[in-house]
């Protein structure tokens, strides 16, 4: 027989392991387990002697009984408002602890139970069930920190998890429920027939007093600001009853009569249940600021954004203890389980560069996801099980017990403030209506909704309870309802008479000077040579007791020498000068991404590691005393949550330069939802600017389809209304000016940078000191090698690495009459600059766009639309690049080289080695293959040139497309 068979079988092996540790060294265990095993051994000694004692085994059984109820009591708690009883748990049977019902009246004491008992097993069992098996079930015994476990037990067990509520508190709680219920009824009554969705909170009204408890009790604990994120379910009620958004403003949004904020201009706007809001509201005799971030319908996507906002605010408000600004996230049960970004965001919670001191999570567990029941959406008992990975305490609460919800909220808030850890509130409730007000839920859940239809509302249940307790009369309840209805009716009249105005600026006062976009996009960004020397000296200096890697020491020396001589300033050096100069000017810097401290391509080396000890040193953080902070952080291996966090960080404080770098640009599509919903569209939807910089390594070098391409075409397709900038710098100095421009302007736009890989070590791309001190950003770089512009017959526009490939080939082949122009900023499209370039080449009859990417990718379609209208007569527009392809790039290096040779050969040689008649002949041969192309030729719309003969199979030759296009007539 196993020596611990009288324990829970599930725990026997674990206890056996602890016992082995006890035998080696009793002090290695905490006091509870020491006493446990001491009693066990004492019992064994007496059993071997003259008499048998039942006291020691009983004591051990009692201790394990208490432990098991703490660990497993939630499994039999009454959590479901719809009354689906949970069966008794076999591991809580008395026989598991070596006891029986015949011993219920024995005096067993209470071991380490903190609650009051009369000493009998019966009373202890009743108190354990009252604490852990009523309408609150708690999961906290998996927490490794003993202090956290004891703190929770000491606050739950003495009051049996059921604090007393005064008459005043109970009435206030009831009125919150009534206001929430009547609000939903009012919206349905007035607008329910107009197909306007509200995503009602009905069935989960208890979250209103729960959230207000977090706010009020948090204020009493010293919390100054709560930053919230939540989806659509119940959002309007939370705005009205937690953030105190005026009813008349919400009603005006239903009527679509609300006036826009004049400080933010136009925009497309968004549906009312996506909009954000911020307000200062009274709480515990003081004011607390609450903000609710705007969010899309993409569930849980706002989570890392809110965390980034909180971290930025904690930084600039010097909340080092992270106890004054708190994140609060409201989730749905199905989404919390189903969306991977939840896991990613939880993983960020304890990482040094991203932790916010703990998030209060509230799950509106209405036991359904649109039409999907829990058993089809997860395999775990609870939606919160994913949170066990961060050892967060989890409070499961019955939503029909609003007092239990408030009590759990108080515990959760206090725990977060005490231990700076995440905490979970899982409110079991139901959804009285369908997914939206037009949805017919009984189509898919007929049994559930038959039960819901008969079930009284939470408000009615609680009102009857208070009436029975004598805390209020039925007339008092009716009066509360009357007051709530009158307030809403009055607010609707006010909304009709006086159109309220949106308050976008209230979301963050730091943006008050950045809300209007000025006409000037390109301020001065040059820096004096003295400043550059100061940066170079400081950023290459290490302490006397620090030993860098020998090769790194050489790199640092070369960087400083390049700045001093003014020649050969490479990309890592140019970035260092940009960041250092901004730091000296007072701009905080944050650079985040996978492997950014060294750089994926070993080009940055911004964080140095001592060769002997591994100690880290950041030269840019030590340029001078009292400089602003710089954080250069290797992120976890995730794109979506990390990018969302950095977006949130940048949105909270426009004074920071915030940069996120992808390991390769190809992986950026792992964060596509953040890009689509926030980076590209937030200004238009919610009038929120953002200055985030995205660094996306991009370039075709034969490395295959996942290491070549940063989805340039997708970013350009998202561009409209000056919503962001898309650039591809071709020199370190251009990169330098782009970063500085991002901060020097008086407005903020996201900056998407296609960054080089091959060019990082290409000396032809390096910059001179004059490029930093005498110039600012050039949106377009003209060809510096053309002495006689009238001799140019063809102008090749391009962007990025392909410029250097073309230039090297042109020089090698001594090609004349071809100018190569770099477009550094693709969007906003530099129309004026390109018009100026075209005016210089008056004799050019062919204007071309050249790109590495396939025809259906890259910038071709974007540039085609913009260049066509700028062509002078009789010039034609031509495309040189790879043909359309399903995959971004070939995985075969030889194929890549052949494609590149063919592409460059066409772009540089065809106009000079073949006559126009020969070109036309080739185009006819191609077009003869399909009737539509012949028609296109007759209509003057499209001409395709066959590739030059190469030593490749026909299908290889076809991998490069050369297309001419006549200028469209106005």
List each language-model region with its residue ranges.
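Flexible, glycine-rich loop/tail regions that form catalytic "lids" or insertion modules at the edges
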Residues: 57-67, 74-106, 181, 246, ...
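Active-site pocket-lining segments that scaffold enzyme catalytic pockets across diverse folds
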Residues: 187-248, 554-561, 569-583, 587-588
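Cofactor-binding active-site loop characterized by glycine-rich and histidine/acidic residues
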Residues: 224-391, 395, 601-653
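Subset of Sec-pathway N-terminal targeting signals
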Residues: 1-40
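Conserved phosphate-handling catalytic cores of large alpha/beta enzymes
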Residues: 369-380, 388-424, 428-434
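Extended, charge-enriched "interface" segments that sit outside catalytic cores
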Residues: 40-206, 223
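Active-site cores of enzymes that catalyze phosphoryl transfer or operate on phosphate-rich substrates
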Residues: 162-180, 184-187, 256-307, 311-318, ...
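Long, low-complexity, intrinsically disordered segments
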Residues: 937-970
């Amino acid at each position: 027989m196993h020596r611990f068979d009288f324990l829970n079988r599930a725990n026997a092996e674990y206890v056996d392991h602890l016992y082995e540790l006890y035998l080696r060294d009793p002090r290695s265990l905490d006091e509870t387990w020491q006493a446990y095993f001491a009693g066990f051994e004492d019992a064994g000694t007496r059993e071997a002697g003259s008499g048998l004692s039942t006291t020691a085994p009983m004591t051990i059984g009692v201790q394990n009984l208490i432990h098991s109820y703490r660990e497993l009591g939630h499994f039999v708690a009454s959590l479901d408002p719809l009354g689906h009883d949970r069966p008794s748990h076999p591991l809580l049977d008395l026989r598991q602890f070596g006891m029986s019902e015949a011993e219920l009246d024995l005096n067993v004491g209470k071991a380490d139970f903190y609650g009051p008992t009369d000493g009998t097993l019966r009373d202890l069992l009743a108190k354990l069930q009252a604490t852990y098996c009523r309408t609150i079930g708690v999961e906290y015994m998996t927490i490794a920190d003993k202090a956290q476990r004891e703190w929770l037990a000491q606050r739950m067990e003495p009051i049996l998890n059921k604090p007393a509520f005064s008459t005043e508190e109970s009435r206030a709680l009831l009125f919150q429920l009534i206001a929430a219920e009547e609000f939903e009824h009012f919206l349905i009554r007035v607008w329910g027939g107009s197909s306007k969705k509200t995503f009602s909170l009905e069935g989960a009204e208890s979250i209103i007093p729960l959230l207000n408890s977090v706010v009020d009790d948090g204020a009493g604990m010293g919390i100054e600001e709560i930053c919230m994120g939540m989806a659509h379910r119940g959002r309007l009620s939370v705005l009205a009853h937690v953030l105190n958004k005026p009813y008349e403003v919400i009603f005006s949004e239903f009527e679509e009569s609300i006036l826009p904020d004049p400080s933010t201009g136009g925009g497309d706007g968004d549906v009312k249940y996506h909009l954000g809001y911020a307000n200062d509201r009274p709480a515990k005799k003081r004011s607390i600021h609450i903000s609710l971030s705007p969010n899309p319908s993409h569930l849980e996507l706002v989570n890392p954004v809110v965390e980034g906002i909180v971290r930025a605010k904690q930084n600039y408000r010097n909340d080092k203890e992270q106890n004054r600004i708190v994140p609060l996230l409201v989730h749905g049960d199905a989404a919390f389980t189903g969306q991977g970004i939840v896991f990613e965001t939880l993983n960020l919670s304890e990482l040094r560069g991203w932790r916010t001191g703990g998030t209060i999570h509230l799950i509106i567990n209405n036991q359904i996801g649109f039409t999907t029941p829990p058993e089809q959406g997860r395999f775990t008992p609870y939606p919160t099980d994913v949170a066990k990975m961060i050892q967060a305490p989890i409070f499961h609460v019955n939503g029909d017990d609003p007092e239990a919800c408030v009590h759990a909220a108080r515990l959760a808030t206090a725990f977060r403030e005490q231990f700076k850890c995440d905490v979970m509130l899982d409110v079991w409730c139901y959804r009285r209506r369908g997914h939206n007000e037009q949805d017919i839920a009984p189509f898919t859940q007929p049994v559930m909704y038959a039960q819901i239809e008969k079930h009284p509302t939470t408000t009615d249940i609680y009102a009857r309870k208070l009436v029975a307790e004598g805390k209020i009369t039925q007339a008092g309840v009716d009066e509360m309802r009357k007051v709530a209805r009158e307030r809403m009716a009055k607010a609707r009249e006010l909304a009709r008479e006086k159109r309220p105005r949106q308050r976008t600026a209230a979301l963050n006062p730091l943006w008050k000077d950045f809300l209007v976009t000025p006409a000037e996009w390109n301020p001065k960004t040059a820096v004096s040579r003295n400043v550059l020397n100061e940066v170079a000296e400081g950023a290459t200096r290490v302490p006397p007791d620090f030993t860098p890697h020998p090769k790194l020491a050489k790199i640092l020396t070369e960087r400083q020498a390049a700045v001093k001589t003014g020649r050969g300033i490479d990309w890592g050096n140019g970035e260092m000068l940009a960041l250092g100069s901004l730091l000296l000017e007072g701009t905080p810097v944050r650079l985040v991404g996978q492997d950014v401290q060294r750089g994926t391509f070993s080009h940055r080396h911004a964080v140095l590691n001592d060769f002997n000890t591994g100690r880290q040193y950041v030269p840019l953080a030590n340029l001078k005393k009292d400089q602003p902070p710089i954080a250069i952080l290797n992120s976890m291996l995730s794109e979506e949550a990390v990018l969302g966090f950095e977006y949130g960080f940048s949105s909270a404080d426009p004074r920071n330069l915030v940069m996120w770098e992808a390991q390769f640009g190809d992986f950026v599509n792992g964060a596509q939802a953040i890009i689509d919903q926030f980076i590209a569209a937030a200004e238009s939807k919610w009038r929120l600017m953002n200055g985030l910089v995205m660094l996306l390594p991009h370039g075709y070098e034969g490395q295959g389809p996942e290491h070549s391409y940063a989805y340039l075409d997708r970013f350009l397709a998202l561009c409209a209304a000056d919503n962001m900038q898309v650039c591809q710098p071709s020199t370190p100095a251009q990169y330098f000016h782009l970063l500085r421009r991002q901060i020097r302007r008086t407005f903020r736009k996201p900056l998407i940078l296609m960054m080089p890989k091959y060019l990082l070590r290409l000396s032809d791309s390096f910059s001179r000191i004059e490029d930093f001190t005498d110039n600012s950003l050039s949106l377009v770089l003209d060809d510096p090698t053309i002495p006689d512009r009238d001799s140019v017959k063809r102008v090749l526009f391009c962007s990025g690495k392909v410029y250097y490939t073309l230039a090297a080939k042109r020089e090698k082949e001594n090609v004349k009459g071809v100018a190569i122009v770099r477009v550094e900023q693709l969007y906003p499209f530099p129309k004026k600059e390109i018009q100026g370039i075209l005016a210089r080449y008056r004799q050019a009859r062919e204007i071309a766009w050249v790109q590495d990417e396939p025809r259906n990718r890259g910038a071709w379609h974007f540039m085609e639309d913009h260049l066509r209208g700028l062509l002078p007569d009789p010039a034609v527009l031509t495309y040189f690049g790879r043909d359309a392809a399903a995959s971004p790039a070939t995985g075969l290096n030889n194929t890549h080289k052949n494609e590149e040779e063919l592409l460059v050969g066409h772009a540089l040689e065809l106009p000079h080695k073949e006559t126009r008649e020969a070109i036309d002949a080739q185009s006819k041969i191609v077009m003869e293959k399909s009737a539509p192309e012949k028609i296109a030729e007759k209509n003057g719309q499209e001409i395709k040139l066959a590739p030059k003969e190469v030593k490749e199979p026909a299908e290889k030759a076809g991998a490069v497309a050369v297309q001419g296009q006549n200028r469209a007539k106005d």
